[in-house]
């Protein structure tokens, strides 16, 4: 993170935005070559590899996965061959597991997600507190802004675990509404992409 006064931002967020614009432009201009591994797909993968390599220097595996996944679906939308896409998916999933289990802290976070009660006071603490938050919400929630878990119990509740706080404050019904709105947002985005008159706007 880079601090500017009282604010801070992650450089990877800016890189992510620039990469999406670049890929949308490049695929719209040279999309007819996307099925050519050397002249079409290869150069785009090279740019992606450079970007995710820089992000991993931070290191930030979560953003790396998000960036790679976004570009993957852009390649799918641009008409890349299924054989190439399947190969990329296999290599990508294998690469993620290698990155997870070659760093002890990542492996601990992954295993803690599968069984947080194994280490409830350290690696499993955040997951357990998020479950408490969701369970406390019940059907209708405790009320907007009245969460107890966000008062120093659940770390990073405004980013990584915002959904748990939503569940506590709005309850099961409120969470269903939020999920429904997210699906509506996705559907509207897909509809806009499909009906967009130019390839750049559609991919973007």
Region locations from a protein language model:
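Extracytosolic (periplasmic/ER-lumenal) interhelical loops and adjacent juxtamembrane/interface segments
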Residues: 124-145
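Long extracytoplasmic/lumenal interhelical loops at the membrane interface
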Residues: 138-170, 193-196, 200
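Hydrophobic alpha-helical transmembrane segments of multi-pass inner membrane proteins, especially
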Residues: 1-126, 164-204
């Amino acid at each position: 993170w880079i601090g500017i006064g009282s604010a801070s931002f992650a450089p990877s967020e800016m890189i992510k935005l620039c990469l999406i614009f670049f890929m949308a432009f490049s695929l719209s201009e040279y999309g007819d070559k996307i099925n050519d591994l050397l002249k079409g797909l290869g150069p785009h993968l090279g740019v992606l590899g450079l970007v995710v390599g820089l992000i991993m220097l931070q290191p930030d595996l979560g953003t790396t996965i998000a960036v790679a996944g976004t570009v993957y679906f852009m390649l799918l939308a641009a008409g890349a061959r299924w054989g190439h896409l399947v190969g990329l998916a296999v290599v990508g999933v294998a690469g993620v597991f290698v990155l997870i289990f070659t760093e002890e802290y990542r492996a601990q976070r992954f295993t803690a997600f599968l069984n947080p009660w194994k280490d409830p006071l350290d690696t499993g603490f955040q997951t357990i507190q998020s479950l408490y938050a969701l369970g406390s919400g019940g059907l209708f929630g405790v009320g907007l802004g009245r969460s107890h878990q966000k008062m120093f119990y659940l770390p990073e509740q405004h980013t990584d675990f915002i959904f748990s706080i939503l569940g506590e404050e709005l309850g099961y019904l409120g969470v269903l509404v939020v999920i429904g709105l997210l699906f509506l947002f996705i559907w509207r985005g897909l509809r806009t992409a499909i009906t967009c008159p130019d390839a750049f706007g559609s991919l973007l």
